[in-house]
């Protein structure tokens, strides 16, 4: 499909399997439920292991079902290559571990998903990797946070849980001026609404569990290589990609894989050694979700904007944190980066405190109380006591998470039913 520029809705259905399955003529992508692959002869096996011949070696590294999924997400994001792994957390961890090691430093946004925040501030810190957490939209603070040993700037298109909007272009300009790549988590944005690589991001990560899968059935993560960062021009800073790798007889991934060096090294080294592989079945299920991504996201956004309008006028909801509102500090960025709308995951403040927030949540009937977002079903949770509960009071305040904060993930049910459910729950507090 490379000879013609197709629209998103077409790409999400066809990339990676432009022709029927060559063995069975099946139109649907088969589930290749196998652990390993037969080599034609000993030379063929040696060439595969030596990276001289691209192809399947072992199920921990590659799988044909997985390969279609990777190619499709990469195409939708405008990247050169993709790598699917077992979860979104694995995708974030591997992307950072690929260039960070003891003695290095990361600058990260202060509005991250709680799991990513803990990974950066606690887990990576135990490995000798220091961090500075800042409002990355404050470019002066971002500049001040960058140190000689800073290897990456990390942010999300929409912050979690408040859906703050990241100024990707401005942040990328600062990072690149310091010869540092920008990694962006586009889970909440989705490639249907925004493609961070087009705005200057170098690497994009996803929890495919969320919008890509869309139905709350399968875990998965994806890393997309934009192919835009020149690792060899910064070889001393990024030796894992631009200098000989001793575990591959001195191969240099920037030479062996070219623009796809970033994800190739993760697959060949980190995934090989640590094994957070996605199963063929999960890759298949996530492909089914991907094929309807545009349709679902349109409905998510349409419903969310109507809910925002309703709640912003309700006397028991003193605050709605959504960038579509003219009074939101990121409203101008929202208009710039999301001309077709976005942000079906956001927070509200319930009048009162934790008691009232819990009463509201427990009174909802359509909304499910669970630790996920971006499902076709509407979801709700209390971040202060769940998803962000490991944070200190200072960290919670920095992210504007209070005992009265409630996170909503608006699904694709009929909008009247969603609003009626919110109304009856608010009536009970």
Please identify what each model-predicted range represents:
Residues 2-63, 71-72:
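N-terminal "arm"/small-domain region of PLP-dependent enzymes with the aminotransferase-like
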Residues 2-3, 20, 83-314:
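Conserved PLP-enzyme active-site core in the AAT-like
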Residues 2, 121-122, 130, 148, ...:
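PLP-dependent enzyme catalytic core of the Aspartate aminotransferase-like
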């Amino acid at each position: 499909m490379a000879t013609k520029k197709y629209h998103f809705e077409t790409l999400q259905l066809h990339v990676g399997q432009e022709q029927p399955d060559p063995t069975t003529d099946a139109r649907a992508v088969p589930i290749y439920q196998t652990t390993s692959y037969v080599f034609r002869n000993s030379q063929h096996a040696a060439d595969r292991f030596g990276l001289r011949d691209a192809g399947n070696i072992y199920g921990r590294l590659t799988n044909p079902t997985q390969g279609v999924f990777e190619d499709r997400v990469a195409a939708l994001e405008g990247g050169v290559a993709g790598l699917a792994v077992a979860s979104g957390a694995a995708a974030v961890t591997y992307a950072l571990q690929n260039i960070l090691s003891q003695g290095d430093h990361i600058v990260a946004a202060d509005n991250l998903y709680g799991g990513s925040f803990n990974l950066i501030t606690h887990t990576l810190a135990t490995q000798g990797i220091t961090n500075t957490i800042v409002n990355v939209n404050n470019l002066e603070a971002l500049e001040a946070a960058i140190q000689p040993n800073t290897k990456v700037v990390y942010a999300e298109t929409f912050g979690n849980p408040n859906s703050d909007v990241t100024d990707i272009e401005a942040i990328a300009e600062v990072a690149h001026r310091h010869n540092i790549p920008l990694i962006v988590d586009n889970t909440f944005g989705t490639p249907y609404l925004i493609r961070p690589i087009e705005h200057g991001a170098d690497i994009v990560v996803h929890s495919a569990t969320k919008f890509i899968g869309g139905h709350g059935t399968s875990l998965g993560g994806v890393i997309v290589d934009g192919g835009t960062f020149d690792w060899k021009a910064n070889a001393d800073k990024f030796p894992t990609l631009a200098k000989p790798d001793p575990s591959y007889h001195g191969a240099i991934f920037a030479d062996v894989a070219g623009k796809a060096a970033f994800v190739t090294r993760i697959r060949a080294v980190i995934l090989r050694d640590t094994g957070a592989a996605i199963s063929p079945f999960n890759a298949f299920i996530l492909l089914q979700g991907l094929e309807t991504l545009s349709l679902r996201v349109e409905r998510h956004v349409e419903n969310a904007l109507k809910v925002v309008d309703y709640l912003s006028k309700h006397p028991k909801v003193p605050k709605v944190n959504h960038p579509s509102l003219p009074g939101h500090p990121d409203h101008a960025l929202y208009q710039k980066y999301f001309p077709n709308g976005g942000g079906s995951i956001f927070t509200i403040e319930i009048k009162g405190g934790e008691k009232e927030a819990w009463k509201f949540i427990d009174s909802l009937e359509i909304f499910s109380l669970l630790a996920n977002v971006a499902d076709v079903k509407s979801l709700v949770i209390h971040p202060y006591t769940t998803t962000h509960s490991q944070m200190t009071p200072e960290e919670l305040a920095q992210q504007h998470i209070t005992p009265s904060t409630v996170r909503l993930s608006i699904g694709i049910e009929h909008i009247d039913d969603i609003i009626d459910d919110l109304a009856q729950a608010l009536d009970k507090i």
